[in-house]
Amino acid sequence: MIDVDKIRQTIVCGLKDTLGVPVIRSNTPRALPKLPFCSYTIQSLLKNSEGTWQRIGNGIDRIPARQVWSITVNTEKYITCAKLALLAHDFFSKSGVIWLKDNGIVIEKVGEVTPRDTLITVDYEHRQGFDVQLGIMNTQEYSEDDVIESAEIDGQYIKDGGNINDE
């Protein structure tokens, strides 16, 4: 299972340090902080990559996976919004890449920065944002008791990692 809280804490702390503004989850029931702030939505919590589970030992299996995050900067002034959105984009595309990798997150793709204003907010708030695709590892604990040592299929016995034997 992916550690959603660790990934969230890593990204939120990195963005907060980079931008110097509060970073919150979008669509929160809590009161919003004063402008400027950055918000995020996890658009895709888990998509296993094309591949198979790999047994890495110590009771752990893993498979490469992806998450997609939507990052939005909210400010009163357009120029502040543009600068903060570009800083956030740079965090995912360059300045934070090694730090994120050291915390188990690989950046696979950073989208273009686009306006995210709405008609309701256009007079008093500016929004710019982008999507970022994260490469992560989905892990699962296993027990040796869970291993199928052999199977019979159409009179053929499959065992020892896939060897077919007549018995």
Predicted regions located by residue number:
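Small/polar-rich, solvent-exposed N-terminal microdomains that initiate assembly or binding
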Residues: 1-59, 149-167
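Positively charged, small/polar-rich N-terminal and surface patches that mediate targeting and assembly
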Residues: 10, 17, 128-139, 144-147, ...
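Residues in well-ordered beta-strands of folded domains
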Residues: 24, 41, 72, 108, ...
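A broad, low-specificity signal marking well-ordered, structured residues that form hydrophobic/aromatic
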Residues: 37-39, 69, 105, 130
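Residue-level signal for secondary-structure boundary sites
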Residues: 48, 79, 138-142
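Oligomerization/assembly interface segments of phage tail-like spikes and tubes
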Residues: 61-79, 86, 125-136
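Short amphipathic alpha-helices in soluble, non-transmembrane regions
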Residues: 84-92, 147-148
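Acidic-leaning, charged glycine-interspersed low-complexity segments
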Residues: 91-141
